[in-house]
Structure formats: structure tokens, C-alpha cells
Amino acid sequence: MTRSEALFEQAKKTIPGGVNSPVRAFNGVGGSPLFIEKADGAYIYDADGKAYIDYVGSWGPMILGHNHPKIREAVLAAVHNGLSFGAPTELEVQMAEKVIAMVPSIEQVRMVSSGTEATMSAIRLARGFTNRDKILKFEGCYHGHADCLLVKAGSGALTLGQPSSPGIPEDFAKHTLTAVYNDLDSVRTLFEQYPTEIACIIIEPVAGNMNCIPPIPGFLKGLRTMCDEFGALLIIDEVMTGFRVSRSGAQGHYGVTPDLTTLGKVIGGGMPVGAFGGRKEVMQFIAPTGPVYQAGTLSGNPIAMSAGLAQMEALCEEGLYEALSAKTKRIAEGFKAAADKHGIPMAINYVGGMFGFFFTEQEQITRFDQVTKCNIEHFRTFYHGMLDEGVYLAPSAYEAGFLSMAHGEEELRLTLEAADRVLARMKAAM
């Protein structure tokens, strides 16, 4: 038994399922999860001391790589001044100014402690601002575990949402409508059914929780047009894509302007941080300047702000995003080339510093229903093969992969060589 396996058995005695977030349990791929001892650059090290080239990056935040010296030094310096004050700090102001400078649609921003808190607060604000109750989300998109967001589509296009988890009253879920990602007709159908009741659309601009699904041309701008037509707000959930797809997020990359934006992951530099911001007219509706209540004991925590600021400043380096995109393209297209070489059907998607691959004969994946038809058994086999080769991918066929600036030529080469060997073994076993 490895030390990771022993720790997992020990953890299950005191922690539900042995983990503090379900995907970490390896239920999507089988086997026992790795327990991580440390991380540095492009590598993570498990409790047994084995090194892995990491394409999870703490689920997105580690865009510069693990244990980046500038972030580490900023955190250590901040710790000397105290861990938490429960009062305003200059660091919060600097972070707000940095976010606003990088994302043109954000005129004011509120710091929180997680992505879930950011989306939950943005939706409450949208409902308060519009005085409407219903929200519109998309099948396969994930915006955190708030009650109104853990909702799946009903049996028909016009059916009200149904809870996707026990513990969520149907009275909550009925206010959440679910449309088809990359399908404007499904959105218009819902708006025409509830023309004066929808407070907002919330969307992942690149859906990263059904693997990696970019928007088709015109989709995001079409949502903007419909929101304007029906008086709803557009919330772009950039918790995953913010400062990862481009310096101004996915909204900058695709040229669409939301009313509100939610952020997380990258802005924390590895610390627990979320944020929501947007038009000043809307943001002034939040307490203490407006009637919509939102608060948080650790919001704007000085240690988290220090880490986030250090990372955000580093991301302003000229040419960084072009280099990151080139690395991502090489990995995604390299996986595809290896699969083609061995006659294993695969489709790929990638944008900025995130990518996805699908074991499928479908040439292009643009919707959730296509993702569910992919070969999960092939993914599981490939996953464990890569893990044995020292490459750590997301342990779910429904999660995106992430590159960092720490992934160099050697890491990319070793990863693609490993993929070639694993796919060759898979083909031989068919």
C-alpha cells in the first residue's frame, strides 16, 4: 500500500469520502487519489515522493506555476504584518484597481473568498437590481454549489428547473431556467416564455466544467443582444477563465461586454479569493451603498490580496499570454496527433491556457449532450496510463486541463512522449 492509499483510508474515517471536494476522490476514474506533499513549478509531488507533471494547477489558479518565488515572497512579507484584520486595507484598494485596469467592463468590484460566493452574490445583486426572480443558466455549466445553481434541465425546453442535489427545495429550483450551451434558439425560447421575469443570464464563457467547450462564433454576443432586448443582466462567470484565457479574460478574447463578471482562482494566486464586479450603476446596488446585502468576515484578506496582487502584476508581462497559448496548443494538438497515429478517435478543444480532449468519433464538441456520448472507459484507461507515466491530469472526463508558464520544453516533450506510449498500449489492447 502506498502512503497516498494509506492516507486515503485514514481520511475516510474523519472526512466524508476522504476528501474536501468530491472530484478529488477519483470517483470519475477509479482508484485512490494522490495525496500531495508539495509542488514546485510544473510539478507536484505525492506523499510517496513521486513527481508528476501537473496539468490541474490546483484547478486553474497556478498560471505561473506552483510556488512561484514572487508570490511566495509577497505572502511571507504580508504574514509578518498579521493574518486578518476584519477592516479595510490598502491591499484591497490596490487589488480593485488592478482588476479594473485589466477588465474594461468592471467599474467597481467587491472581493469575496470563493468563486461560489462570487456567483451567488452576483445573482442576488442581479435579482435585486432588476426586481426579477428567475435566472437562466446552461446545461453542463457549473457556477459553484449555491442552491439556485445546482439545478438541471427538466424534461422539456420550457420545463422549470429541477434540483440536482438533495437538500435543495423545488421552490428554489423553479426559478432557475436551463438552456442549451451554444444554442441561441433555446435561450430565446425561454425569454419569450418569461419575457419580464428573467433577472439575468449567467454563463461560463468557455465551459470548463463539461471538459473544455469554447463558445461558437456569435453565441456570447447573441446573449448580450437578448439580455438588452428583454431587460436582463448578463453575468459572465470568469472564475475559471478570468486572466487565464487572456489578460482581460474570455470577455476580452471574444469581444463581449457583460453587466457583471465573477472572478476567482487566478486572482488569488493560490489563496482563497473570489470577486464580482461590473457596471457602477449595478454595483452601487450592493450594501452599504444599496439595499442588496452581501458581507464576509475574510473578504479582502490581506494574505490573499498579497498573493493575488503579486500574480496579477506578473501577468502583465509582455508576450506572456501568447507564450501560454502556444504551450496549450502544442499539448492539445500533440494529444490529437498521437491519437490519430494509433487510430484512436479523439476530438480536442483549447483556448488560452486551458484545453480539453474527448475520446469520440465526433469531429467537434460544442454541447453538453455531445460530451456525455464520449468514451469514458477510454478516458479512464488513458488517465491511469498517464498517471503511471508521471503526468497528472484532471481525474474526470468533465474537467478542463490547465497549462502554466512553468511548463517548459522538457515538460511538454515528456508529456507528449508519455501520451504516445499510453495510446499505443491502449490500441494494442483493443
From Swiss-Prot:
Q: Where in the cell is it found?
A: Cytoplasm
Query: What pathway, per the record?
Result: Porphyrin-containing compound metabolism; protoporphyrin-IX biosynthesis; 5-aminolevulinate from L-glutamyl-tRNA(Glu): step 2/2
The record ties this protein, via InterPro entries, to:
4pyrrol_synth_GluAld_NH2Trfase, Aminotrans_3, Aminotrans_3_PPA_site, PyrdxlP-dep_Trfase, PyrdxlP-dep_Trfase_major, PyrdxlP-dep_Trfase_small
Q: Does the keyword Isomerase apply?
A: yes
PANTHER family reported for this sequence: GLUTAMATE-1-SEMIALDEHYDE 2,1-AMINOMUTASE, GLUTAMATE-1-SEMIALDEHYDE 2,1-AMINOMUTASE 1, CHLOROPLASTIC-RELATED
- Describe, as the record does, how this protein assembles with itself and its partners: Homodimer.
What name has this protein been given in UniProt? Glutamate-1-semialdehyde 2,1-aminomutase
Q: Which organism is it from?
A: Shewanella sp. (strain MR-7)
